[in-house]
Amino acid sequence: MQEIESYKHYANKWEFDTIFFGGGTPSLLPAKYLNKILEKLHSIFDISNVKEITLEANPGEASLNHLRDIKSLGVNRLSMGFQSFNNHILKLLGRLHKSEDCFKTFHNARKAGFDNINTDMIFNIPGLSIKSWKKDLSKLIELNPEHISAYSLTVEPSTKLFNLVKNKELLMPIEKIDVEQFLITEDILSNEGYKHYEISNYAKKNKECKHNLNYWKLSPYLSFGPSAHSYDLKKRWWNIRSLEKYINQISKKKNPIEDYEILTKKDHYNEIILNGLRLSSGINLLDLNGYDKQNIDKIDKKWDCVSVSNNKIKLTNNGFLFVDEITQDLFI
């Protein structure tokens, strides 16, 4: 709250059309405190144009009454971290919920009146067969969420899973399995009416995540809390990671910002590439000031999965599999 207050002298520089409560377990926050945050935002900033307010809700952590309460505050989108419907896989990933919690929380959200729900799923997991992944997708489709995020597993350092893989107690799937599960996801969800609008994201008509689209299109954003990152087109800055140190700074009425970076023209150019190629709509070349047409033509010839036309460069669905390599080719 105090950090939000600290921006009151710069409030007129910011315009928002989305709000996102994430970065942990915001669904555990009592509705009255969530309301206080929204009231504080309203008192400092002009949020009259906000159309999407998302809250992350982990399965098993949000009761029906709580969901009804947050819905009444104006929260109109939920994002649920299902990850899997296999309890063995959930345990392997270090998740605290069970498969049945996913269904219960989802149905409670529907009862509470939510008609815009995202579900996060993960593939490329040790022990997750093609058959099991198809089964997960089938169960998910039965729930019929408006939005689905499907990510290939990234094993983070300092986790139990990382140590198991490092010590060869678990083997990560071979690349062929990762690719096949990605393509299966695209095929099944597209046939069910989901638009594959970003590498890892699928949405029903007009249900794309506006908040994340703002990130990928490099719109300015302002974030609050430990580790929060912000961006104003010219620079990025981020807060202290430690909760204890963050609270200590705020209690002393000191700035919790840990560091910042000024973005060069090269940085901005490369970030348009990095983020824009993730989107099925691709990149408007006119946004790339000083782009090298010869290099674009060269990449168009090199990669069959790259499409260049009408001042647009974008990837096919198969092209998403090579996005890192193509991005490197386009960087300056």
Named regions from a protein language model:
Residues 135, 286, 309-310, 328:
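Intrinsic-disorder/low-complexity regions
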Residues 1-10, 14-289:
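C-terminal scaffold of the Radical SAM
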Residues 289-303:
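Short amphipathic alpha-helical interaction segments
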Residues 312-316:
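Minor-groove-contacting beta-hairpin "wing" of winged helix-turn-helix DNA-binding domains
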Residues 302-311:
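A short, conserved structural fragment
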Residues 157, 295, 322:
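Short phosphate-engaging motifs
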Residues 318-332:
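Short, amphipathic alpha-helical interaction segments positioned at domain boundaries
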